[in-house]
Amino acid sequence: MMDNVHHGTEHHTPMNSSELVGPQDNAAHLEHATHQIHNTPFSALLTAAMLFFGISACALFFLSIQHAAHAGWSVIVTRVMEAVSSFIPVGGIILLILTFLNVGGIAHLYHWMDPDLTNPNSPNFDVILYEKSKFLNIPFYVVRILIYVIGSWFFVWKIKKVSKRLDETKDRKDYKALYNWSVGYIAFFGFASAAWAWDFLMSIDPHWYSTLYIWYSMVSTLSLSL
């Protein structure tokens, strides 16, 4: 019966993976591999910079909690936490450089930056990225990165400055100022640490999202900073 059905028609079942692809596929795979090799240094730098920037920001967050709570025991670790948080400017500069390398097209860590993906007339149009483009667009993204870096840089500079001055003057006014700036950083960190986890890390794959990701990111770096 089967011989009658297939009579006159030759069927060939691929025996291995090499028969499933053609020369055009090899070219596409080569392009993809080249793209990955090109991005490897940038992805490694982003991972390291984000890790240590997060640790230093969490160290300042922990220190600010002690100042806001008027804790006395933390005086023995104050200078240690301030030293750890001193990496914020360095990590911030590295993250800014990576941001502008991606915006300039030198690095390609964030494929949502490709304008073709949000252009309805493009053959590469992605409806999911189009819907997210109100948040994931280059101008707004750069503004947010600047807020994270400059804001964290300002708070670590200000808190360390007031803390050092308080050691010298023992002035109640400086004590109150240290409290106020610490409370300000706690509020800033609460919003910024969530948003920079989205921007620097989760937006690498903008089709995937998790409501718990920001907590994993913050708690991981906070535990490391301690």
PLM features: residue spans?
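Flexible loop linkers connecting adjacent transmembrane helices
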Residues: 68-83
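Intramembrane catalytic core of multi-pass membrane enzymes that act on lipidic substrates
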Residues: 84, 88-158
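Central hydrophobic cores of alpha-helical transmembrane segments in multi-pass inner-membrane proteins
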Residues: 53-71, 152-156, 160
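Long, contiguous internal "core" modules enriched in hydrophobic/ aromatic residues
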Residues: 43, 132, 137-226
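Low-complexity, proline/glycine-enriched hydrophobic segments characteristic of transmembrane helices
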Residues: 2-40, 117-123
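Alpha-helical transmembrane segments of multi-pass membrane proteins
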Residues: 1-5, 58-62, 100-104, 191-200
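Loop-to-helix transition at the N-terminal end of transmembrane alpha-helices
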Residues: 37-54, 79-82, 212-218
